[in-house]
Design a protein with these regions (language model features):
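Cleavable N-terminal export/targeting peptides
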Residues: 1-25
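Extracellular loop and loop/strand-boundary signature of outer-membrane beta-barrel proteins
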Residues: 46-55, 106-115, 157-167, 218-222
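Short glycine/proline- and aromatic-enriched beta-strand/turn motifs that initiate or cap beta-hairpins
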Residues: 20-72, 215-225, 232-238
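Short loop/turn motifs that connect adjacent beta-strands in outer-membrane beta-barrel proteins
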Residues: 21-27, 70-79, 130-141, 183-202
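Predominantly the C-terminal beta-signal and adjacent terminal strand-loop region
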Residues: 23-25, 179-239
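Residues that define the transmembrane beta-barrel architecture of outer-membrane proteins
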Residues: 26, 57-63, 115-121, 141, ...
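Gram-negative (and chloroplast) outer-membrane scaffold detector with strong preference
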Residues: 66-159
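Residues on the lipid-exposed face of transmembrane beta-strands in outer-membrane beta-barrel proteins
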Residues: 32-34, 63-69, 83, 121-129, ...
Length: 239
């Protein structure tokens, strides 16, 4: 190579800001999402439908937000510890006892409104595998697994909006998920976003969670475990 050409290329490279040459360091991640959730409150009742199903119906939307700090990160992925919270609310009508024509009794919906609200809080450990998405942009998928200790803070309101019951139930959860790397759509814009804001990557994620939230098997607590599994999707930023 001509010496003058080599010097010109080297000078141009040195003139670039460091942020344009090297991706910013990895601190952690932030995510926001939502998914269907149905607590297994009726599990203790032999008859169907149980009180929850009669009063509040089936599943509802639970919204979640979380942030994690990477304690170990390399080319394969990262291990993160973090915190998540969210909100769930389901409205319904209370039940009253009705006497049937044959003399038997049954519970039927009344005109009194009621609601169950839950604020879940989670202490999480997440293992992320980003190597495929980082190395092969034609396979822009990242995978992750998460374990968490859970506390679901809940309350029930009456027709006037006052709390009639409240409490907290502890437990655990496990999650497995996949995330689609949106950087692959426009790598140039992704680099600009990293340079300007420090956001390394943007993902759309989808995951499956099983939560066992029953005070570790206590018969005295409400069972707020997921009925089967819950599905969630959302947006995740890695920075």
């Amino acid at each position: 190579m001509n010496a003058k050409v080599f010097v010109a290329i080297a000078a141009a490279a040195l003139a670039l800001p460091a942020s344009a040459q090297v991706r910013s360091g990895r601190w952690g991640s932030f995510e926001i999402g939502a998914g269907k959730y149905e607590p297994d409150v009726d599990a203790e009742f032999a008859t169907r439908p149980g009180p929850y199903e009669q009063i509040l119906g089936g599943s509802g939307w639970m919204f979640r937000v979380g942030a994690s700090k990477a304690i170990l990160a390399n080319d394969l992925g990262a291990i993160e510890v973090g915190f998540r919270t969210g909100y769930f609310r389901k409205n319904g009508n209370g039940l009253i006892q009705q006497t049937n024509p044959d003399g038997s009794t049954s519970l039927v919906p009344s005109g009194d409104k009621t609601a169950l609200a839950i604020v879940p809080t989670s202490a999480t450990v997440t293992l992320r595998f980003d190597w495929l998405a980082e190395r092969y942009r034609f396979v822009p998928l990242s995978f992750y697994g998460r374990a968490a200790l859970e506390r679901y803070n809940w309350w029930v309101t009456d027709g006037q909006g006052d709390w009639s019951q409240k409490g907290g139930t502890n437990g655990w959860s496990v999650t497995g998920g996949a995330a689609l790397l949106l950087d692959a759509i426009d790598p140039g814009r992704a680099r600009e976003l990293d340079n300007d804001t420090g956001v390394n990557h943007t993902y759309l994620f989808f995951d499956v969670t099983h939560a066992q939230v029953d005070d570790f098997g206590s018969s005295k607590s409400w069972d707020l475990s997921t009925k089967g599994v819950s599905l969630q999707g959302g947006l995740m930023l890695v920075f």
